[in-house]
Amino acid sequence: MECLRLARAALDEMLAHARAAHPEECCGAVLELGGRDVVRRFTNIQARLHREDPASHPRDAETAYAPEPKELFAALREGEAPGARVKVFYHSHTRVGAYFSGEDRARAMFGDEPAYPEVTYVVVSDSRTPGEVRAFRWDEGARDFVEVPIEVC
């Protein structure tokens, strides 16, 4: 499977976002705009969701994320412009390494299909293994998300 090519500045921005959000998880997207990788940070509203309805949202923002819908939709619209695309959705793990958890997979799915099959999901760790970054993409043959190498350029 093809690797994820990611600009150094975008990777650095994702890591900075994770450090700034700690001890909460961060989330965002990388858009490809005119051949450049541009990071869009999203507000993690998981703490508010948990506070307002802990039965429906049992995890707080230290162990889960929920992007602010208006920010997410703005990035999706921006990615639909000519010469643009949503390249990456990213989030951080604050207490564990950078792996694609069952919760991450569930959030990336729409029923039995990936919600955004063309988008790569990046998980960064800012605690247990600071700076660890791993990428995952849908593999139709495996019917699952598989790890792909990251080429930083």
Kindly give the residue locations of the regions a language model identified:
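Conserved beta-strand-loop surface patch within small alpha/beta domains used
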Residues: M1-V86, G97-C153
